[in-house]
Amino acid sequence: MGAYDELMKRRGRALLPLLDPDKVISEEDYYERAVKALCEYAATFLVGGSTGVGQIETEKTVALVKKNCDKPVTVFPGSPCQVAPSADAILFMSLLNSTNRKYLIDYQLEGSLLVYRYGLEAIPTAYIIVGEGGTAGWVGEAKAIPPEKPELLSMYVLAAKYLGFKVVYLEAGSGVKRSVPPEAVRLAKKLLGEEVILIVGGGIKDEEVAAEILRAGADGVVVGTVVERDLSAAERIARRVAGWT
């Protein structure tokens, strides 16, 4: 089953662990344990999100996941040099609220032939930075959407829907203090309906935050920093997302 089909199958309880190749290649033993621990709960593993990481590091991380889990591996690219031929899929993203056109369309043009050549499953994804934004917002030169401005979020979410994106990814930023607020998630899901998958990431530190986001209507949650820092907490989140606790 492909990555998109796995997301559809697990709508409302999809877990997407995010692995940073820069961290993985320096702590392989730890991440092998992490992949094994989260495998049964994951819809797909995301690989990427790093700055200064190329195809070699991304490929090594994809290989580590595939060695320890049979779930699809999806590239979460920071640039075209992270497109990995051994991956199963790629979030073919546009950072809609970036002020730099390379994150809107230039990187997509550069990467499109690689995606085609490698035969990756391309999942059209609208990436939208909300709130603090963290490193993702800074690197992506995004005008982060203030959570208290629902009309701004509505414009971006509807634009993503009408442009035909299959997935909308609301990102608060890695390691931020606050995740995307439930009311913002609820609004986004109301506007997207069942036509578009809604995933949310950033600031998901424990199972209660994850459950709150899913109750608000998200189809899935992305967890990255908590996997790096506290595998036990990541497992608790995974069990709650799966509905097993």
Swiss-Prot record:
Keyword entries, A-Z: Cytoplasm, Lipid biosynthesis, Lipid metabolism, Magnesium, Metal-binding, Phospholipid biosynthesis, Phospholipid metabolism, Transferase
Binding site for Mg(2+): D20, S50
Localization, UniProt: Cytoplasm
Name of the molecule in the record: Geranylgeranylglyceryl phosphate synthase
Enzyme Commission code(s) on record: 2.5.1.41
Enzyme class: transferase
SUPFAM superfamilies, per database record: FMN-linked oxidoreductases
Pathway of action: Membrane lipid metabolism; glycerophospholipid metabolism
Gene3D superfamilies linked to this entry: FMN-linked oxidoreductases
Entry cofactors: Mg(2+)
Catalytic reaction(s) noted: sn-glycerol 1-phosphate + (2E,6E,10E)-geranylgeranyl diphosphate = sn-3-O-(geranylgeranyl)glycerol 1-phosphate + diphosphate
One GO term of the biological process aspect: glycerophospholipid biosynthetic process
One Pfam family matching this protein: PcrB
UniProt keyword annotation of Membrane present: no
Binding site for sn-glycerol 1-phosphate: Y169, L170, E171, A172, G173, S174, G175, G202, G203, G224, T225
Function: Prenyltransferase that catalyzes the transfer of the geranylgeranyl moiety of geranylgeranyl diphosphate (GGPP) to the C3 hydroxyl of sn-glycerol-1-phosphate (G1P). This reaction is the first ether-bond-formation step in the biosynthesis of archaeal membrane lipids.
Source organism of the structure: Ignicoccus hospitalis (strain KIN4/I / DSM 18386 / JCM 14125)
Entry GO terms, CC: cytoplasm
Major site of localization recorded for this protein: cytoplasm
CDD domains in UniProt: PcrB_like (cd02812)
One annotated GO molecular function: phosphoglycerol geranylgeranyltransferase activity
